[in-house]
Amino acid sequence: MGEPQQVSALPPPPMQYIKEYTDENIQEGLAPKPPPPIKDSYMMFGNQFQCDDLIIRPLESQGIERLHPMQFDHKKELRKLNMSILINFLDLLDILIRSPGSIKREEKLEDLKLLFVHVHHLINEYRPHQARETLRVMMEVQKRQRLETAERFQKHLERVIEMIQNCLASLPDDLPHSEAGMRVKAEPMDADDSNNCTGQSDQQRENSGHRRDQIIEKDAALCVLIDEMNERP
């Protein structure tokens, strides 16, 4: 017979899959798909488990004697188990001193093992509560971060509105309104010979170009103010 196979505490590294999940394969959709969900049973740490098993199995289903009642206080039972472990450990030391080869040594070791199993079982029964508390804390942190982000956004928005109002207040009063600049004046096509093909004279084009230059300068000044605001901490 061959030697029993050693079961590793950790799964082996999936080196055969690393080369398949390159950036190019992922972009082109050539990366292997994830395995389908397990429906029946699976192996973990050398043991077989069923998918419909309870997360925390009762002690009786594992063939372990129950030392505490069905209805109990976890804190009190953990304190009692902790004290029992200490007393049994002292008894074990006494046995090792007086009669190391006695059969009571094995019995005391089994008692300690049973007590530790119960301690771990009671601690594991707190795992669902711990998961709920962890989820609650995580959601509270996310909520606080979103509120802080919204508050910072509101402050930046108020600063932008204030700067725009200051810029508007600094504009000259004789600056033409945007509506007047956007409005297109309909003129007959039979203009005199001094006008060009669009019905505008050279003087009108010069005036409109001058106004356009003034508006561009104001826009550039506003952009500089906004850039300075973004650079501030």
Curated annotation (Swiss-Prot):
Keywords: Activator, Isopeptide bond, Nucleus, Phosphoprotein, Transcription, Transcription regulation, Ubl conjugation. It is found in: Nucleus. Gene3D superfamilies: 6.10.140.200. One of its GO terms (biological process) is somatic stem cell population maintenance. One of its GO terms (cellular component) is mediator complex. InterPro entries: Immune_Mod/Transcr_Coactivator, Med7/Med21-like, Mediatior_Med7, Mediatior_Med7_sf. GO terms for molecular function: transcription coregulator activity. Residues 188-213 are annotated as: Disordered. The modification Phosphoserine is found at residue 194. Its main location: nucleus. Pfam families: Med7. There is a cross-link at residue 185 (Glycyl lysine isopeptide (Lys-Gly) (interchain with G-Cter in SUMO1)). Component of the Mediator complex, a coactivator involved in the regulated transcription of nearly all RNA polymerase II-dependent genes. Mediator functions as a bridge to convey information from gene-specific regulatory proteins to the basal RNA polymerase II transcription machinery. Mediator is recruited to promoters by direct interactions with regulatory proteins and serves as a scaffold for the assembly of a functional preinitiation complex with RNA polymerase II and the general transcription factors. Belongs to the Mediator complex subunit 7 family. PANTHER family: MEDIATOR OF RNA POLYMERASE II TRANSCRIPTION SUBUNIT 7 (PTHR15498:SF74), T-CELL IMMUNOGLOBULIN AND MUCIN DOMAIN CONTAINING TIM (PTHR15498). This is Mediator of RNA polymerase II transcription subunit 7. It comes from Sus scrofa (Pig).
